[in-house]
């Protein structure tokens, strides 16, 4: 069979993938000692293979943090997310953070900020527009991008690449924990007050009930201030989430509204934690439209 009339090309950008190390962190002796190299994967639109040449030298960029209950991540599990956004015309930088078993809070938010600064430091080589950078994360990654985005260049922080800013244009939070002090107020399958639960481990292996001040310090909602600028934020949460209660997003949305912050909230009615609903084209379209309007 010969196809003669091919019609018009309507495919999106082909995507190149490569991996780098964005920082080497020292691990304290209490958590085993030594050091760890933290990788970051870049997904970049490829112009050379486009049927019509386009004069683009720098792309809007999304730094993505994959959720893991603050434990070890399997970053490339979300390959479909990264590629499906990158092919629409974004650089996606998917980072690995230190897991809570070797470095509890505030390690993850510090790693996220360091990754943003690394992207800015190497912007020309990576074809990144330094003035158009957003954060996106799911679950504990959502918590991390909220922490990092709400605090920007203020603490908790590190001095790695400190000559570059960690501030971002927008944040996309998919079903992240927003108030660690209130996780057990609503039904879920986790014991979030236990030292052995994800939040207890993130706080250093302690009980949330015994250390409410530390739990509050690790909660993104704590860092909202009326007189401090906050990046526009898109919240998306599944109505059937049994891991992170839907109310966590409600609490954040309500607080941001009270403080006059720019925030959008989308409920995926039958969405569960990280699966049904979030891998659909509709969800990707929502993310893309939000990024287009804020980057």
Show where each model-derived region lies.
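Alpha/beta-hydrolase superfamily serine-hydrolase fold, recognizing
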Residues: 1-295
